[in-house]
Swiss-Prot record:
SMART domains associated with the record: BHL
SUPFAM superfamilies named in the record: IHF-like DNA-binding proteins
Coiled coil: none
One GO-annotated biological process of the protein: regulation of DNA-templated transcription
UniProt subunit comment: Heterodimer of an alpha and a beta chain.
UniProt protein name: Integration host factor subunit beta
Organism: Paraburkholderia phymatum (strain DSM 17167 / CIP 108236 / LMG 21445 / STM815) (Burkholderia phymatum)
Location of the region described as Disordered in the Swiss-Prot/TrEMBL record: 56-107
Keyword Plastid in record: no
GO cellular component entries: chromosome; cytosol
Protein family (similarity comment): Belongs to the bacterial histone-like protein family.
GO MF annotations in UniProt: DNA binding; structural constituent of chromatin
Length: 107
C-alpha cells in the first residue's frame, strides 16, 4: 500500500474528510513519526507494533568497483517490530493468495 492509497482509503472510510484533509492527516502523522525517530525516540502503537532504531557498528567494507577496503562508519537505522496482534493476523492470512490491487478493509 502506498501513501496515496492510504490517503484514499482514509478519505473513503471517513466521508466528512475531503482528500486534501486526509492527505494532510497522513502527512502530519508520518512527519511526527519521522521526527520522533530522528530524535532517537521509540514509537509504540499497541496492537500494531513499534518503531525504533538499531545501531549498526562501523566495519571494514570493500569498494565493489576497485576492490579497495573502506571504513564504513557506524550508523543508526529505523527498525519495525510487529506487535502480537499484527503477527497473529498476518499468520492467519498467510495461506491465502496475495491480492495485488485489493485494499485491506480492516486498516
Amino acid at each position: 500500500m502506498t501513501k496515496s492509497e492510504l490517503v484514499a482509503q482514509l478519505a473513503t472510510r471517513f466521508p466528512q474528510l475531503v482528500l486534501k484533509d486526509a492527505d494532510f492527516a497522513v502527512k502530519t502523522m508520518l512527519d511526527a513519526m519521522s521526527d520522533a525517530l530522528a530524535n532517537g525516540h521509540r514509537i509504540e502503537i499497541r496492537g500494531f507494533g513499534s518503531f525504533g532504531l538499531n545501531r549498526r557498528p562501523s566495519r571494514v567494507g570493500r569498494n565493489p568497483k576497485s576492490g579497495e577496503k573502506v571504513l564504513v562508519p557506524e550508523k543508526h537505522v529505523p527498525h519495525f517490530k510487529p506487535g502480537k496482534e499484527l503477527r497473529e493476523r498476518v499468520d492467519r492470512n498467510a495461506g491465502e493468495p496475495l491480492k495485488a490491487d485489493a485494499a485491506d478493509d480492516d486498516l
